[in-house]
Amino acid sequence: GAGGALFVHRD
């Protein structure tokens, strides 16, 4: 969803 990739990298 909205910038999901960015959140995933925040791990």
Curated annotation (Swiss-Prot):
Cofactor mode of binding and number, as noted: Binds 1 [2Fe-2S] cluster.
GO cellular component: mitochondrial inner membrane
EC number: 7.1.1.2
Catalytic activity: a ubiquinone + NADH + 5 H(+)(in) = a ubiquinol + NAD(+) + 4 H(+)(out)
Bilayer topology term: Peripheral membrane protein
Regions annotated as coiled coil: none
Superkingdom to which the source organism belongs: Eukaryota
Subcellular location: Mitochondrion inner membrane
Main location (coarse class): mitochondrion
Cofactor requirements of the protein: [2Fe-2S] cluster
One Gene Ontology molecular-function label: NADH dehydrogenase (ubiquinone) activity
Enzyme class, first EC level, given as a word: translocase
Disulphides: none
Keywords: 2Fe-2S, Electron transport, Iron, Iron-sulfur, Membrane, Metal-binding, Mitochondrion, Mitochondrion inner membrane, NAD, Oxidoreductase, Respiratory chain, Translocase, Transport, Ubiquinone
Annotated function: Core subunit of the mitochondrial membrane respiratory chain NADH dehydrogenase (Complex I) which catalyzes electron transfer from NADH through the respiratory chain, using ubiquinone as an electron acceptor.
Similarity field: Belongs to the complex I 24 kDa subunit family.
Subunit structure: Core subunit of respiratory chain NADH dehydrogenase (Complex I) which is composed of 45 different subunits. This is a component of the flavoprotein-sulfur (FP) fragment of the enzyme.
Name of protein: NADH dehydrogenase [ubiquinone] flavoprotein 2
Organism listed in the record: Canis lupus familiaris (Dog)
Lineage: Eukaryota, Metazoa, Chordata, Craniata, Vertebrata
